[in-house]
Amino acid sequence: MHPRFQTAFGELPATLQSALQSYIDAPDFPAMLKAEQVDAITQRCGLDDDALAFALLPLAAACSLAPISQFYVGAIARGQSGNLYFGANMEFSGAPMQQTIHAEQCAVTHAWLRGEPALASITVNYTPCGHCRQFMNELNSGVSLKIRLPGREPATLGDYLPDSFGPKDLDITTLLMDQVDHGFQLALTDELEKAALAAANQSHAPYSNAHSGVALEAEDGTVYTGRYAENAAFNPSLPPLQAALILMNVSGDDCQKVKRAVLAEPESAILTQWDATRATLAALGCQNVSRITF
């Protein structure tokens, strides 16, 4: 079991510990549970899916990186597949607060990067802030997305974000988590560059068309990729570096041990991720950063 889970796991009910043990003990536990694993756990513990999601929140919050706030938030995203994806807030010392990742953003992006086509619900241990409500409004599940909080009746994103402004107001029909392939091509031989380009091809940037992707190489050679997730309200957009850091963190790797990074983005786009990517990675101790353009 990854050390970060030990305290929270020890505080779970004994029946849930027993049901989870074999999954969470796996050295490659991906901070998610597949639908068949969820079914096995709920049947063994006598929980319904919602009760299980609430019970898992302390484990999700254990993935939090909060050196600035010391405020640990966990979120569980339920995919239409029935899979459950952990998410947590992530802060980076030495980087501006604008680079912070909220727990809901983390869970949503985690699901997206794992190939989940749409979400059914988000369970979180604190009320979603306005930033996260707007971020989730970009999803293909729209305002019907279920939001569940401890001690409250289930509600929809539409209840939390009435009279919302979103992609449809800008005549955007391709939404976040829709499967896309933008078809950008380069003659590449470097595997990390290929991974960054592949991520850019699956990014969501309908407002700027500045599609971008990042690939990070960990010290052991594992590669984590992230895609740009643009938002109709612009500011809640999630940069591709943050998406890659999400996958790195939930996978149990150390975001301060990035060996090498590659950004892929257009040569002449109206905006660039380059400066922010380099600056944030520098704050994390990585200087080996390169850029490829298409």
Swiss-Prot record:
Instruction: Name the Gene3D superfamilies for this protein.
Output: Cytidine Deaminase, domain 2 (3.40.140.10)
Query: PROSITE patterns annotated for this entry?
Result: CYT_DCMP_DEAMINASES_1, CYT_DCMP_DEAMINASES_2
- Please list the GO terms describing molecular function: cytidine deaminase activity; identical protein binding; zinc ion binding
What reactions does this protein catalyze?
cytidine + H2O + H(+) = uridine + NH4(+); 2'-deoxycytidine + H2O + H(+) = 2'-deoxyuridine + NH4(+)
The organism's superkingdom is given as Bacteria
Binding, Zn(2+): H102, C129, C132
Q: What residues does substrate bind to?
A: N89, M90, E91
One protein family per Pfam = dCMP_cyt_deam_2
Transmembrane portions of the chain: none
Q: What class of enzyme is it?
A: hydrolase
> GO CC terms for this protein?
cytosol
Assembly, in brief, is: Homodimer.
Cofactor names from the entry are: Zn(2+)
Q: Name one GO biological process term.
A: cytidine deamination
Reported function: This enzyme scavenges exogenous and endogenous cytidine and 2'-deoxycytidine for UMP synthesis.
UniProt keyword annotation of Iron-sulfur present: no
Q: What is its EC number?
A: 3.5.4.5
Family assignment from sequence similarity: Belongs to the cytidine and deoxycytidylate deaminase family.
Specify the species: Serratia proteamaculans (strain 568)
Q: Which UniProt keywords apply?
A: Hydrolase, Metal-binding, Zinc
Q: What protein name is recorded for this chain?
A: Cytidine deaminase
